[in-house]
């Protein structure tokens, strides 16, 4: 029997090898499975964890994700006399409105280390009179003990301090003591609100950014400190000194924006701006997919990760990969590496990734022209606590609502939408993703192509009016 022992050993090794070669057969809609050695969920391409037969079994298409075709500030037509979206009111509106996305409401009106992103909910004990609450929220109050703030005028043209996307896709702008939430066309009802009521920090702040990973934590900077939030809740141990968390980054920064890692093995970056210089900082690690299970996935990150399915690896590496620096690099001059951007900026924000290309006339004919502004925000398709999987039919129907046909801003093509149309067609080979960065200075802003690091040459040219293109304010032109 001794001569047979090697055969048994070889057979055992072969069986173990086959067991390691897990398949995606029957798993394409089951989501992430921590117990498996390889994955078949829609994010496995980004995490480089797909099973060997993922492409064959699951047949992923980049068109099943949210695909934007134009940058945030482009219109179907440049109609400067369009009616504003009721944003001519210049006073603060302390009315009761629903919080955006899955942000948690505050239960205490006082400032505590843990801050929530909804100041509207009343304290449970004892409830004050409505008149008293209005006096607290109204910025022009003169009651003793209540700070006085100047009345905020939406279309005043004053510079903004910060812009950032939250993990649920909401876009927030900060100016002075106040913050705004922006929707697809203008400012959401109920804004502006005091930053202290919404974030638990007394404004003004210096800068803000949200990391583009599965957790999507938001960072606010003020003076020598910074605050970190997850799902609207301040993380324990914050605020912290900038020198502790971001070694090499100066205090009192002017602006900041974050970029994703080109893949899970890469590193996220954030750019800080102060005066005429900027600093590039690299995070040393990002959370794993398993660490993010059980919580809501960042919609901004999901949009980026789904684009990894297509053959754009080289472009993403060019955009988001850099040599390792272990923290902050030496400061550089803005004018040297960001061509066309003013020497000093007030705020900055990374725009959404959009895809340019062209369509045949027959494909365009199936769509109806839309005059809606193209600043559609990210839409999360997963709720907190729900398993991250859907059937192929439900996935297709839910995502098609937010899907746009490919177009080119340079060629003047607009965005077409039809919510009942089946979107299972392939991306044209000529399409490629473009990442924009927005720089805000005074009452104007600039859009920069991250790949060329130059201000986009479009019509109307940059700089453009922040009030008109981002706030929905009426134009002075007739």
Curated annotation (Swiss-Prot):
Per the Swiss-Prot or TrEMBL annotation, the motif Cell attachment site is positioned at 64-66
Residues that bear Phosphoserine = 311, 362, 398
What positions does the record give for glycosylation? 86, 168, 241
Annotated positions of the Sulfotyrosine modification: 75, 78, 80, 278, 281, 416, 419, 421
Task: Please indicate which superkingdom the organism of origin belongs to.
Answer: Eukaryota
Boundaries of every SMB domain copy? 20-63
Q: Which residues carry this modification: Phosphothreonine?
A: 69
Q: Where is the composition biased (Basic residues)?
A: 364-389
Name the UniProt record assigns to this protein: Vitronectin
Q: Which organism is it from?
A: Mus musculus (Mouse)
Highest lineage ranks of the organism? Eukaryota, Metazoa, Chordata, Craniata, Vertebrata
